[in-house]
């Protein structure tokens, strides 16, 4: 489902959070899954996305997809798509952001690499969230519901 005209579903915003797949590297931990943890599908679950989901207002509908475990939906039932990532995930993260934006979704970029260099994401995301989510995600959610999300949210305090 693509977004409604006002950007939200009638029963509350639907948010899809995506953890992009890791390229084959040390950070993909495929070696650990083969050698140390046979039968397991992931070593490092996306706990940052679980934190974002917990910070959303209770009437929001949140789904988390870890692309290292399952495929991302091409036409999700969502009003907003958030794609987070680390530096090693940059290529796939920006690919996903650009795709979902091109097909009509509002997209938000976040994660540790976004926090280090938010300017790299300005061209592929409607909103860039730089910094610790605990400080800025609730404000983004309020602004999104009012139909006035900013292009950049930067956390200025410390955790």
Regions found by a protein language model. Give the residues of each.
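A short, charged/proline- and glycine-enriched loop
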Residues: 9-13, 77
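Glycine-rich beta-alpha loop elements in corrinoid/cobalamin-binding modules
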Residues: 48-159
């Amino acid at each position: 489902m693509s977004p409604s005209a006002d950007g939200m579903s009638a029963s509350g915003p639907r948010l899809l959070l995506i953890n992009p797949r890791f390229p084959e590297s040390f950070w993909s931990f495929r070696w650990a899954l083969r050698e140390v943890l046979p039968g397991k599908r992931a070593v490092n679950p996306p706990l940052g996305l679980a934190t974002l989901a917990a910070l959303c207002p209770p009437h929001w509908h949140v789904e988390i997809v870890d692309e290292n475990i399952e495929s991302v939906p091409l036409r999700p039932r969502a009003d907003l798509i958030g794609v987070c990532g680390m530096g090693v995930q940059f290529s796939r993260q920006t690919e996903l952001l650009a795709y979902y934006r091109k097909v009509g979704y509002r997209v938000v970029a976040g994660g540790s690499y976004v926090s280090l260099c938010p300017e790299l994401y300005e061209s592929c995301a409607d909103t860039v969230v730089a910094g610790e989510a605990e400080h800025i995600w609730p404000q983004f959610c309020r602004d999104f519901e009012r139909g006035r999300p900013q292009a950049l949210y930067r956390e200025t305090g410390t955790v």
